[in-house]
């Protein structure tokens, strides 16, 4: 043991050659004895003189710093290293482990860059982050160096402004990030974020120190599947599943009938009563199943309904022996009385009334006097205070051309203005039908209206098919409905005499007031008959009357002079003054109208959504010709892109051509991310392969562009090689590199991203 003094301090030296120490002393005791670090002992081995004037004060400071660094002697670290073989806990405390950790830390410090996120004015740092391996903090792509990171940030994240600083003594490499003023000016940031100068720049990134390689096969995530109930009523539906869809307003379609034979009942029960107004009334009669008067002694009938919309004291005629279907009467007036119904059975008889003081007389089972009852219940219409304007058919100018006036028809007296009778299309109104031909003359005498005088012309309208001006006898098996607008018509008593039929008919012909212009009776084309038909069946019949206080003579059952009666009842038709128009088939027009209505009905049953906002839109917006908001036209964008490139100076035509094709391709295929670029390069090479082969300058600019993409890390060498191989290969072999077919600039394709 030796004693030496260092700067006035006494240090104890322990040597292995000392005779006083035993060889069997434990290592722990030696560790306890060695209380000084290794540098102290090394300094003690060199001879030092405390009186030497050549030593400087700086050497004393270095020795003290070395002593402070090492808190344990070398033997302690050696002992910890040997013990760490059995217990890994001691490994991190050994000297070798600490030295390796420091070297690793120094080697890794070269790839760290600090990002300072500043406000718009670049005056205040809002947030700071340190990334490793020269990685981008936004997309986490390693750029390989300071220069590569600089190129990547400027090209891929152009919404921000970057300022780069090299590493110096006081700090490492840093990057200041701030939002460009143009980003706020052109509305990239929303207005609801408040003042962007006071709001910090927020972004999402992962801590790269915590990323580890994990085996997905061992760590399989178990998903907890939660099944939610789906409300089927909120889903859009079509018309195939017999359901109704509501767009914006609470609109519902009328109920559907399982049989086409019940359509008339559904329509009559769902029609709303329309209040009277001071405006002129414009009645309109549609095509199919138009209201007809009751028919006497009809069997196997379907859906008989009477719809009356009159003013005062209107009575509906009775029905005799109606069987096997619903009979419904719809009354919407005041003080209406219904005459008796005779012997109706086998179905529901329903009466729907929305008026006041409605009374019904008792029913009878007699069916012989039905025609007599009809004659007594026909009211007349009071003259209106204002002229009635009715819809005039566009085909009225063709009627007089096809049918000329007959010699047996009487001439019509002149009137101040022409009165045109207008009749609608199918199954048009006809007078009530009798049980046999013997009663045809009786019905005709009672159903001829008198035309009242008016200052304005009355234009009733009748369209084409199956029109008859005389009654049909013994019809059955179809829908029957009567719509009447008449008031206070008294009918005279009936007689059973048949001798004076011609005299009766002459007295019951409608009296037409004198006028200065002729009256024109207008009837449409198809299947028009001016004579009565016996035993006609399976067609709808309706009567619409607008008469004023006409007395009806008694009826007879004679049928001998029917032809003479009809000859006296037909008025003459005047020639129209309108120009001739070529006849168009009514059936073709009806077919086109029905197809259009069916198409619109199918569209109304669907729910449409906006292509960009994904919000439901109404059917009117779908059918409108206006464009939706923020929608752009590709053709207009192509023209603007071409004009923008034409303004460039110092650029060749081939380069402009290449830039135009690439920009159009990127916009139409929606290449918006860095991961889409490899797929876009391959598909662009396939699309313009032939043009690149024919033009060397085009191929040159394409190669230069790929080199720039490769330098910036947007494509890899594998993608570069694929593009070159596509250009050198035949057209049949070009499609084997990607999963999709050849690209098309106007169609979207599936994308493959380089890993």
UniProtKB/Swiss-Prot annotation:
InterPro entries: Polycomb_protein_VEFS-Box. GO terms for cellular component: nucleus. The keyword Repeat applies. Residues 390-404, 474-483 have a biased composition (Basic residues). Keywords: Developmental protein, Metal-binding, Nucleus, Repeat, Repressor, Transcription, Transcription regulation, Zinc, Zinc-finger. Residues 503-514 have a biased composition (Polar residues). Residues 590-725 are annotated as: VEFS-box. A zinc finger (C2H2-type) spans 136-157. Residues 15-27 have a biased composition (Acidic residues). Pfam families: VEFS-Box, Zn_SUZ12. A- repeats lie at residues 245-266, 284-306, 307-329, 330-351, 352-373, 422-443, 461-483, 484-504, 522-544, 545-565. Weakly expressed. Expressed in late siliques. Residues 234-248, 298-309, 321-333, 346-355, 416-425, 455-464, 516-525 have a biased composition (Basic and acidic residues). B- repeats lie at residues 267-283, 374-390, 405-421, 444-460, 505-521, 566-582. Residues 267-582 are annotated as: 6 X approximate repeat B. Residues 245-565 are annotated as: 10 X approximate repeat A. Polycomb group (PcG) protein. PcG proteins act by forming multiprotein complexes, which are required to maintain the transcriptionally repressive state of homeotic genes throughout development. PcG proteins are not required to initiate repression, but to maintain it during later stages of development. They probably act via the methylation of histones, rendering chromatin heritably changed in its expressibility. Required to prevent the proliferation of the central cell by repressing unknown target genes before fertilization. Regulates the anteroposterior organization of the endosperm. Probably indirectly associated with FIE and/or MEA. In plants, PcG complexes are probably composed of a member of the EZ family (CLF or MEA), FIE, and a member of the VEFS family (FIS2, VRN2 or EMF2). This is Polycomb group protein FERTILIZATION-INDEPENDENT SEED 2. It comes from Arabidopsis thaliana (Mouse-ear cress). The gene is FIS2.
């Amino acid at each position: 043991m030796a004693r030496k003094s260092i700067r006035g301090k006494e240090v104890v030296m322990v040597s292995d050659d000392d005779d006083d120490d035993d060889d069997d002393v434990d290592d722990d005791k030696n560790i306890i004895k060695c209380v000084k670090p290794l540098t102290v002992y090394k300094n003690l081995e060199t001879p030092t003189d405390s009186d030497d004037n050549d030593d400087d004060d700086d050497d004393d400071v270095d020795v003290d710093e070395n002593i402070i660094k090492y808190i344990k002697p070398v033997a302690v670290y050696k002992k910890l290293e040997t013990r760490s073989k059995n217990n890994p806990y001691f490994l991190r405390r050994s000297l070798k482990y600490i030295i390796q950790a420091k070297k690793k830390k120094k080697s890794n410090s070269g790839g760290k860059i600090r990002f300072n996120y500043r406000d718009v004015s670049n005056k205040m740092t809002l947030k700071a982050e340190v990334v490793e391996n020269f990685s981008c903090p936004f997309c986490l792509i390693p750029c390989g160096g300071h220069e590569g990171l600089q190129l990547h940030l400027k090209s891929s994240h152009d919404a921000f402004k970057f300022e780069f600083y090299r590493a110096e003594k006081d700090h490492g490499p840093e990057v200041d990030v701030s939002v460009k003023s143009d980003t706020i000016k052109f509305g990239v940031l929303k207005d609801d974020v408040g003042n962007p100068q006071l709001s910090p720049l927020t972004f999402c990134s992962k801590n790269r120190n915590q990323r580890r390689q994990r085996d997905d096969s061992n760590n399989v995530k178990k998903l907890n599947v939660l099944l939610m109930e789906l409300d089927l009523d909120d889903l859009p539906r079509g018309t195939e599943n017999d359901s109704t869809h509501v767009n914006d307003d609470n609109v519902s379609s009328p109920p559907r009938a399982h049989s086409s034979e019940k359509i008339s009942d559904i329509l009559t029960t769902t029609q709303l009563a329309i209040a009277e107004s001071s405006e002129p009334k414009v009645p309109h009669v549609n095509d199919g199943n138009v209201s007809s008067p009751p028919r006497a002694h009809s069997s196997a009938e379907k859906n008989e309904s009477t719809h009356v919309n009159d003013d005062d004291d209107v009575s509906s005629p009775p029905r005799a022996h109606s069987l096997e279907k619903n009979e419904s009467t719809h009354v919407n007036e005041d003080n209406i009385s219904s005459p008796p119904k005779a012997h109706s059975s086998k179905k529901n008889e329903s009466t729907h009334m929305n008026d006041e003081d409605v009374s019904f007389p008792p029913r009878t089972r007699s069916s012989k006097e039905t025609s007599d009852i009809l004659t007594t219940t026909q009211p007349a219409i009071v003259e209106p205070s204002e002229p009635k304007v009715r819809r005039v058919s566009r085909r009225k100018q063709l009627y007089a051309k096809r049918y000329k006036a007959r010699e047996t028809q009487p001439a019509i007296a002149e009137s101040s203005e022409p009165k045109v009778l207008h009749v609608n299309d199918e199954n048009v109104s006809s007078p009530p039908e009798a049980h046999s031909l013997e009663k045809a003359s009786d019905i005709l005498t009672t159903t001829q209206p008198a035309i009242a005088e008016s200052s304005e012309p009355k234009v009733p309208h009748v369209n084409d098919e199956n029109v008859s001006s005389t009654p049909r006898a013994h019809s059955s098996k179809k829908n029957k409905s009567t719509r009447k607008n008449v008031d206070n018509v008294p009918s005279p008593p009936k007689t059973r005499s048949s001798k004076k039929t011609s005299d009766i008919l002459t007295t019951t012909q409608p009296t037409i007031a004198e006028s200065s212009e002729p009256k024109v009776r207008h009837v449409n084309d198809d299947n028009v008959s001016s004579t009565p038909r016996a035993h006609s069946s399976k067609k709808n019949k309706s009567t619409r009357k607008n008469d004023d206080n006409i007395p009806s003579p008694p009826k007879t059952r004679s049928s001998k002079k029917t032809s003479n009666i009809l000859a006296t009842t037909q008025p003459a038709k005047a020639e129209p003054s309108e120009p001739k128009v070529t006849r168009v088939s009514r059936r073709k027009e009806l077919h086109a109208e029905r197809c259009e209505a069916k198409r619109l009905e199918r569209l109304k049953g669907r729910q449409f959504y906006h292509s960009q906002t994904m919000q439901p839109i109404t059917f009117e917006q779908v059918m409108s010709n206006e464009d939706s908001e923020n929608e752009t036209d590709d053709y207009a964008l192509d023209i603007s892109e071409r004009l923008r490139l034409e303004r460039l100076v110092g650029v060749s035509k081939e380069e402009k051509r290449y830039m135009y094709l690439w920009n159009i391709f990127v916009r139409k295929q929606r290449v918006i991310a860095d991961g889409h670029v490899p797929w876009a390069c391959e598909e662009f090479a396939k699309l313009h392969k032939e043009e690149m082969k024919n033009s060397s300058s085009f191929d040159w600019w394409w190669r230069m562009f790929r080199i720039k993409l490769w330098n910036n890390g947007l494509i890899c060498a594998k993608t570069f090689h694929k593009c070159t191989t596509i250009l050198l290969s035949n057209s049949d072999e070009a499609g084997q590199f990607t999963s999709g077919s050849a690209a098309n600039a106007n169609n979207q394709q599936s994308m493959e991203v380089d890993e």
